[in-house]
From Swiss-Prot:
An annotated Gene Ontology molecular function: translation initiation factor activity
Pfam families: eIF-1a
Subunit: Component of the 30S ribosomal translation pre-initiation complex which assembles on the 30S ribosome in the order IF-2 and IF-3, IF-1 and N-formylmethionyl-tRNA(fMet); mRNA recruitment can occur at any time during PIC assembly.
Identification of the protein by name: Translation initiation factor IF-1
Main location: cytoplasm
Gene Ontology CC entries for this record: cytosol
Annotated source species: Pediococcus pentosaceus (strain ATCC 25745 / CCUG 21536 / LMG 10740 / 183-1w)
Amino acid sequence: MAKDNVIEIEGTVKETMPNAMFKVELENGHEILAHVSGKIRMHYIKILPGDKVTVEMSPYDLSKGRITYRFK
């Protein structure tokens, strides 16, 4: 899959869900379901409610995404 057609947007984690899923509220007010990317999982980076994150979304399904960065 080509990575040139992804949408990157910032948001805030609202709720943790089972299986490393998170409810993220985006800057534009929408809520999506997001999972953690492999690099974040590999480096044991903890994500808690209230954290500001960057989310990658596919233009084909705008209700799901992947957390790629947690701001310090």
